[in-house]
Amino acid sequence: MWLYLAVFVGLYHLLHWYRERQVLSHLREKYVFITGCDSSFGKLLARQLDARGLRVLAACLTEKGAEQLRGQTSDRLETVTLDVTKTESVAAAAQWVKEHVGERGLWGLVNNAGISLPMAPNELLTKQDFVTILDVNLLGVIDVTLSLLPLVRKARGRVVNVSSITGQVSLFGGGYCISKYGMEAFSDSLRRELSYFGVKVAMIEPGYFKTALTSKERFLKSFLEIWDQSSPEVKEVCSEKILAVYKKFAEQLEQKCTQDLSLVTNCMEHALIACHPRTHYSAGWDAKLLYLPMSYMPTFLVDAIIYWDSASPAKAL
Protein backbone atom coordinates (compact mmCIF):
# COMPACT_ATOMS: atom_id res chain seq x y z
CA MET A 1 0.00 0.00 0.00
CA TRP A 2 2.74 2.46 0.98
CA LEU A 3 4.54 1.76 -2.29
CA TYR A 4 1.42 2.62 -4.31
CA LEU A 5 0.95 5.80 -2.28
CA ALA A 6 4.59 6.81 -2.84
CA VAL A 7 4.23 6.17 -6.59
CA PHE A 8 1.02 8.22 -6.70
CA VAL A 9 2.63 11.14 -4.84
CA GLY A 10 5.70 10.95 -7.09
CA LEU A 11 3.58 10.98 -10.26
CA TYR A 12 1.53 13.90 -8.93
CA HIS A 13 4.66 15.99 -8.29
CA LEU A 14 6.11 15.03 -11.68
CA LEU A 15 2.92 16.14 -13.43
CA HIS A 16 2.87 19.37 -11.39
CA TRP A 17 6.52 20.04 -12.26
CA TYR A 18 5.80 19.48 -15.96
CA ARG A 19 2.71 21.74 -16.00
CA GLU A 20 4.58 24.51 -14.17
CA ARG A 21 7.27 24.61 -16.85
CA GLN A 22 5.06 24.79 -19.92
CA VAL A 23 5.46 28.22 -21.52
CA LEU A 24 3.39 29.98 -24.18
CA SER A 25 4.68 30.39 -27.73
CA HIS A 26 4.91 33.59 -29.82
CA LEU A 27 6.00 35.71 -26.84
CA ARG A 28 7.47 38.38 -29.13
CA GLU A 29 3.97 39.21 -30.34
CA LYS A 30 2.53 39.78 -26.86
CA TYR A 31 2.18 43.20 -25.23
CA VAL A 32 2.42 43.64 -21.46
CA PHE A 33 1.57 46.88 -19.62
CA ILE A 34 3.25 47.35 -16.21
CA THR A 35 2.60 50.14 -13.70
CA GLY A 36 5.17 51.42 -11.20
CA CYS A 37 8.28 50.87 -13.34
CA ASP A 38 10.41 53.64 -11.80
CA SER A 39 12.07 51.23 -9.37
CA SER A 40 12.06 47.87 -7.59
CA PHE A 41 9.72 45.10 -8.82
CA GLY A 42 8.25 47.03 -11.74
CA LYS A 43 11.60 48.12 -13.12
CA LEU A 44 13.14 44.67 -12.79
CA LEU A 45 10.10 42.97 -14.36
CA ALA A 46 10.16 45.38 -17.31
CA ARG A 47 13.81 44.54 -17.95
CA GLN A 48 13.19 40.82 -17.45
CA LEU A 49 10.27 40.64 -19.90
CA ASP A 50 12.11 42.82 -22.40
CA ALA A 51 15.02 40.35 -22.32
CA ARG A 52 12.47 37.58 -22.93
CA GLY A 53 11.40 39.34 -26.11
CA LEU A 54 7.95 40.52 -25.03
CA ARG A 55 6.65 43.95 -26.06
CA VAL A 56 6.80 45.85 -22.77
CA LEU A 57 4.74 49.00 -22.22
CA ALA A 58 6.17 50.45 -19.01
CA ALA A 59 4.34 53.10 -17.00
CA CYS A 60 6.49 55.30 -14.76
CA LEU A 61 5.42 58.02 -12.35
CA THR A 62 8.25 60.32 -13.48
CA GLU A 63 9.96 61.05 -16.78
CA LYS A 64 13.30 60.56 -15.02
CA GLY A 65 12.31 56.99 -14.12
CA ALA A 66 11.16 56.36 -17.69
CA GLU A 67 14.40 57.71 -19.12
CA GLN A 68 16.52 55.51 -16.84
CA LEU A 69 14.52 52.42 -17.79
CA ARG A 70 14.81 53.12 -21.52
CA GLY A 71 18.57 53.37 -21.09
CA GLN A 72 18.69 49.85 -19.61
CA THR A 73 16.46 48.05 -22.13
CA SER A 74 16.04 47.41 -25.85
CA ASP A 75 14.27 49.64 -28.35
CA ARG A 76 11.21 47.37 -28.15
CA LEU A 77 10.31 48.70 -24.70
CA GLU A 78 8.15 51.84 -24.66
CA THR A 79 7.38 54.09 -21.71
CA VAL A 80 4.58 56.39 -20.63
CA THR A 81 4.18 58.57 -17.54
CA LEU A 82 1.24 57.60 -15.34
CA ASP A 83 -0.21 58.76 -12.03
CA VAL A 84 -2.72 56.07 -11.05
CA THR A 85 -4.50 58.46 -8.66
CA LYS A 86 -5.57 60.75 -11.52
CA THR A 87 -8.35 59.45 -13.77
CA GLU A 88 -7.31 61.70 -16.66
CA SER A 89 -3.77 60.27 -16.50
CA VAL A 90 -5.16 56.72 -16.48
CA ALA A 91 -7.45 57.48 -19.45
CA ALA A 92 -4.55 58.96 -21.43
CA ALA A 93 -2.36 55.94 -20.69
CA ALA A 94 -5.17 53.56 -21.70
CA GLN A 95 -5.55 55.36 -25.03
CA TRP A 96 -1.77 55.19 -25.54
CA VAL A 97 -1.84 51.44 -24.89
CA LYS A 98 -4.76 50.99 -27.31
CA GLU A 99 -2.83 52.76 -30.06
CA HIS A 100 0.18 50.49 -29.51
CA VAL A 101 -1.53 47.11 -29.28
CA GLY A 102 -4.10 47.62 -32.03
CA GLU A 103 -6.29 44.64 -32.89
CA ARG A 104 -4.03 42.21 -31.02
CA GLY A 105 -5.28 43.42 -27.68
CA LEU A 106 -3.25 43.57 -24.47
CA TRP A 107 -1.87 40.22 -23.34
CA GLY A 108 -0.76 41.24 -19.86
CA LEU A 109 -1.68 43.92 -17.32
CA VAL A 110 0.53 44.09 -14.23
CA ASN A 111 -0.77 46.34 -11.45
CA ASN A 112 2.46 46.91 -9.55
CA ALA A 113 2.39 50.60 -8.54
CA GLY A 114 2.01 51.05 -4.79
CA ILE A 115 3.01 52.95 -1.65
CA SER A 116 3.34 51.86 1.98
CA LEU A 117 3.32 55.10 3.97
CA PRO A 118 1.93 56.56 6.18
CA MET A 119 1.98 53.61 8.59
CA ALA A 120 1.28 53.81 12.33
CA PRO A 121 -1.25 52.69 14.97
CA ASN A 122 -4.68 53.61 13.59
CA GLU A 123 -5.51 56.18 16.26
CA LEU A 124 -2.44 58.24 15.37
CA LEU A 125 -3.63 58.57 11.76
CA THR A 126 -6.18 60.78 10.03
CA LYS A 127 -8.76 59.89 7.41
CA GLN A 128 -6.54 61.50 4.78
CA ASP A 129 -3.67 59.19 5.75
CA PHE A 130 -5.87 56.23 4.83
CA VAL A 131 -7.13 57.90 1.64
CA THR A 132 -3.56 58.57 0.48
CA ILE A 133 -2.72 54.86 0.41
CA LEU A 134 -6.11 53.60 -0.81
CA ASP A 135 -6.01 56.03 -3.76
CA VAL A 136 -2.85 54.38 -5.07
CA ASN A 137 -2.97 50.78 -3.88
CA LEU A 138 -6.66 50.01 -4.38
CA LEU A 139 -8.61 52.67 -6.28
CA GLY A 140 -5.68 53.20 -8.67
CA VAL A 141 -5.58 49.46 -9.38
CA ILE A 142 -9.33 49.40 -10.02
CA ASP A 143 -9.20 52.45 -12.32
CA VAL A 144 -6.31 51.10 -14.41
CA THR A 145 -7.87 47.63 -14.62
CA LEU A 146 -11.32 48.83 -15.69
CA SER A 147 -9.76 51.13 -18.31
CA LEU A 148 -7.77 48.30 -19.91
CA LEU A 149 -10.11 45.32 -19.47
CA PRO A 150 -11.56 45.51 -23.02
CA LEU A 151 -8.03 45.20 -24.45
CA VAL A 152 -7.12 42.31 -22.12
CA ARG A 153 -10.37 40.52 -22.93
CA LYS A 154 -9.69 40.90 -26.66
CA ALA A 155 -6.34 39.10 -26.24
CA ARG A 156 -7.74 36.56 -23.75
CA GLY A 157 -4.79 37.62 -21.66
CA ARG A 158 -3.68 37.92 -18.05
CA VAL A 159 -4.18 40.35 -15.17
CA VAL A 160 -1.46 40.21 -12.50
CA ASN A 161 -2.05 42.16 -9.29
CA VAL A 162 0.84 42.69 -6.89
CA SER A 163 -0.51 42.43 -3.36
CA SER A 164 1.37 41.43 -0.19
CA ILE A 165 1.31 38.92 2.63
CA THR A 166 -0.47 41.72 4.54
CA GLY A 167 -3.45 41.02 2.29
CA GLN A 168 -3.65 37.69 4.13
CA VAL A 169 -2.59 38.76 7.65
CA SER A 170 -3.05 42.32 8.93
CA LEU A 171 0.22 43.07 10.73
CA PHE A 172 -0.07 46.80 11.49
CA GLY A 173 -2.35 49.82 11.37
CA GLY A 174 -2.89 52.24 8.52
CA GLY A 175 -4.18 51.94 5.00
CA TYR A 176 -1.60 49.53 3.58
CA CYS A 177 -3.06 46.26 4.91
CA ILE A 178 -6.59 47.49 4.16
CA SER A 179 -5.62 48.24 0.56
CA LYS A 180 -4.12 44.78 0.10
CA TYR A 181 -7.16 43.03 1.58
CA GLY A 182 -9.26 45.08 -0.83
CA MET A 183 -7.05 44.09 -3.75
CA GLU A 184 -7.47 40.43 -2.83
CA ALA A 185 -11.27 40.79 -2.87
CA PHE A 186 -11.23 42.72 -6.16
CA SER A 187 -8.97 40.11 -7.76
CA ASP A 188 -11.16 37.22 -6.58
CA SER A 189 -14.31 38.70 -8.11
CA LEU A 190 -12.42 39.72 -11.25
CA ARG A 191 -10.99 36.22 -11.70
CA ARG A 192 -14.43 34.64 -11.63
CA GLU A 193 -16.02 37.21 -13.95
CA LEU A 194 -13.24 37.10 -16.55
CA SER A 195 -12.88 33.32 -16.59
CA TYR A 196 -15.85 33.22 -18.98
CA PHE A 197 -13.74 35.11 -21.54
CA GLY A 198 -10.55 33.09 -21.22
CA VAL A 199 -8.80 35.76 -19.11
CA LYS A 200 -6.76 34.60 -16.09
CA VAL A 201 -6.16 36.69 -12.96
CA ALA A 202 -3.21 36.06 -10.63
CA MET A 203 -2.22 37.53 -7.27
CA ILE A 204 1.42 38.01 -6.25
CA GLU A 205 1.79 38.05 -2.46
CA PRO A 206 5.41 38.82 -1.48
CA GLY A 207 6.83 38.77 2.01
CA TYR A 208 9.33 41.44 3.08
CA PHE A 209 11.71 42.52 0.31
CA LYS A 210 14.25 45.32 0.22
CA THR A 211 12.60 48.02 -1.90
CA ALA A 212 11.78 51.71 -1.63
CA LEU A 213 8.64 50.66 0.29
CA THR A 214 10.74 49.19 3.11
CA SER A 215 13.30 51.99 3.43
CA LYS A 216 14.22 52.50 7.09
CA GLU A 217 14.85 56.23 6.63
CA ARG A 218 11.51 56.89 4.90
CA PHE A 219 9.61 54.82 7.44
CA LEU A 220 11.13 56.60 10.47
CA LYS A 221 10.69 60.07 8.93
CA SER A 222 7.03 59.36 8.20
CA PHE A 223 6.32 57.93 11.65
CA LEU A 224 7.99 60.82 13.48
CA GLU A 225 5.93 63.32 11.45
CA ILE A 226 2.75 61.46 12.38
CA TRP A 227 3.76 61.39 16.05
CA ASP A 228 4.54 65.12 16.12
CA GLN A 229 1.13 65.93 14.62
CA SER A 230 -0.81 63.71 17.04
CA SER A 231 -2.88 65.20 19.86
CA PRO A 232 -1.51 65.22 23.44
CA GLU A 233 -4.34 62.90 24.49
CA VAL A 234 -3.41 60.25 21.93
CA LYS A 235 0.28 60.59 22.79
CA GLU A 236 -0.54 60.03 26.45
CA VAL A 237 -2.55 56.90 25.66
CA CYS A 238 0.09 55.42 23.37
CA SER A 239 3.15 56.68 25.29
CA GLU A 240 6.62 57.15 23.89
CA LYS A 241 7.15 53.43 24.32
CA ILE A 242 5.40 53.13 20.93
CA LEU A 243 8.09 55.39 19.48
CA ALA A 244 10.80 53.06 20.72
CA VAL A 245 8.98 50.02 19.33
CA TYR A 246 8.59 51.56 15.88
CA LYS A 247 12.21 52.69 15.84
CA LYS A 248 13.25 49.14 16.67
CA PHE A 249 10.91 47.82 13.96
CA ALA A 250 12.49 50.17 11.42
CA GLU A 251 15.99 49.07 12.45
CA GLN A 252 15.09 45.40 12.08
CA LEU A 253 13.04 45.87 8.91
CA GLU A 254 15.95 46.03 6.50
CA GLN A 255 17.55 42.98 8.14
CA LYS A 256 14.32 41.01 7.67
CA CYS A 257 14.01 41.99 4.03
CA THR A 258 15.09 39.64 1.25
CA GLN A 259 17.35 41.36 -1.26
CA ASP A 260 16.72 39.07 -4.24
CA LEU A 261 13.82 40.82 -5.99
CA SER A 262 13.81 38.22 -8.76
CA LEU A 263 11.96 35.88 -6.37
CA VAL A 264 8.98 38.18 -6.91
CA THR A 265 9.49 39.07 -10.57
CA ASN A 266 9.91 35.39 -11.48
CA CYS A 267 6.43 34.79 -10.04
CA MET A 268 5.08 37.72 -12.05
CA GLU A 269 6.74 36.41 -15.21
CA HIS A 270 5.34 32.92 -14.65
CA ALA A 271 1.83 34.34 -14.22
CA LEU A 272 2.20 36.08 -17.59
CA ILE A 273 3.85 33.44 -19.79
CA ALA A 274 3.02 30.04 -18.26
CA CYS A 275 0.41 27.87 -19.96
CA HIS A 276 -1.01 27.04 -16.53
CA PRO A 277 -0.53 30.06 -14.23
CA ARG A 278 -1.47 29.85 -10.56
CA THR A 279 -4.08 32.08 -8.98
CA HIS A 280 -1.83 32.95 -6.00
CA TYR A 281 1.96 33.22 -5.73
CA SER A 282 3.69 33.46 -2.33
CA ALA A 283 7.10 35.04 -2.91
CA GLY A 284 9.83 34.72 -0.28
CA TRP A 285 10.46 32.18 2.46
CA ASP A 286 8.81 34.35 5.12
CA ALA A 287 5.62 34.40 3.05
CA LYS A 288 5.69 30.64 2.46
CA LEU A 289 6.76 29.42 5.90
CA LEU A 290 5.32 32.04 8.28
CA TYR A 291 2.65 34.38 6.95
CA LEU A 292 0.78 31.97 4.67
CA PRO A 293 0.45 29.39 7.49
CA MET A 294 -0.61 32.22 9.83
CA SER A 295 -3.48 33.08 7.48
CA TYR A 296 -4.96 29.62 8.17
CA MET A 297 -4.46 29.73 11.96
CA PRO A 298 -7.25 30.47 14.46
CA THR A 299 -7.62 34.19 15.17
CA PHE A 300 -6.59 33.89 18.83
CA LEU A 301 -3.30 32.28 17.81
CA VAL A 302 -2.52 34.93 15.17
CA ASP A 303 -3.31 37.64 17.72
CA ALA A 304 -0.99 36.00 20.26
CA ILE A 305 1.88 35.92 17.76
CA ILE A 306 1.41 39.59 16.88
CA TYR A 307 1.01 40.64 20.56
CA TRP A 308 4.29 38.86 21.34
CA ASP A 309 6.16 41.11 18.92
CA SER A 310 4.46 44.41 19.80
CA ALA A 311 4.22 46.84 22.72
CA SER A 312 1.08 47.55 24.74
CA PRO A 313 -0.07 51.20 25.14
CA ALA A 314 0.76 53.04 28.36
CA LYS A 315 -2.92 53.19 29.37
CA ALA A 316 -3.62 49.53 28.59
CA LEU A 317 -5.80 47.69 31.12
Where do the model's predicted regions map?
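SDR active-site lid
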Residues: 196-278
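Canonical Rossmann dinucleotide-binding motif of NAD(H)/NADP(H)-dependent dehydrogenases/reductases
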Residues: 15-57
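The beta1-alpha1 cofactor-binding region of Rossmann-like NAD(H)/NADP(H)-dependent oxidoreductases
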Residues: 82-95, 127
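Active-site helix of classical SDR
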Residues: 145, 179-182
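Substrate-binding pocket helix/loop in short-chain dehydrogenase/reductase
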Residues: 120-122, 129-131
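Conserved NAD(P)H cofactor-binding loop of Rossmann-fold oxidoreductase domains
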Residues: 112-118
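Residue(s) in the substrate-gating loop at a strand-loop-helix junction
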Residues: 164
